[in-house]
Amino acid sequence: MDVFKISVDTQQVHKITQENFDQVTKKQAPWYQPINGHQGWFAVCPACDNPIQIIGMLERDAPYGKHFFPTAGAVLVPLKGRVDKEEYEWCPYASKNKHLTKDDRRAAGSELAVLIKQTLIEQFDRVIYLLEKGTGMRISFALAKQMLEEYRAAEGWRYRGATRQNIPWVFAYMMQAKRLRGRIFFDAKFTEELLTRRPDLTWNANGQIDIKDDKKFCDLSFSFIRHRRHVDQYTLSESIEFNIANSKQETVCKREIVFEHDHFLKLINSKNEANRKINLVELARSVLA
């Protein structure tokens, strides 16, 4: 992996460089400590919260992190990560391109699952913001509530592909298909593509997708499918597909949404509370707490 954090309790994620590591750890233990007679650099995996060791900090232009499970007496000062071999097995940095299904579940009492759920509640307005940005579609209060209820029913926080970095997009991935008619789109290019493929539709003055002939039925629905994750060298990338399909399950339009891990983490670590929508946070708490 090419990123690290310094404890389970933080969501501040940093690129692995000597300068960044020194800046956030101030060269203190347990992040700096000897192992096997040599200097060691230790941190926490941002995805699974297990300890990691930084490899090649001084010898390589691009040092990287590797999961590390210390044997008794291997380190003098206990490391900050939470040792959990089961989380490690499904960590995107460990399993790399391992195929996931929604049925792959964490244990009900998983500490990481609890943290994912808690973060979703506390940051729900920012989750909705990023989903609207990625889809070009407004998510109404009513739709947000439906999505929360389906996330609760699916226990989405237990999905093996969920991490604290990808909360907005995995939240959407748990949603069942929803009807398209009446949804407000603000992405003109995507909307024009949809209308070209379905000339029976229109984009009304309110920005809503509607049907030209009120006597006819709009059979289109939208969903989020195909969660994919890939590690190239040491860098993780993830995506899902925003899919619009007809009643024959034929795709009419689709868009790949690449997970913006850095943007999400920047938002949740921001001290600026001015533009937050607390009514959405309260909604999430009422459904999930």
Regions found by a protein language model. Name each.
Residues 71-181:
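Domain-exit/linker segments immediately C-terminal to small folded modules
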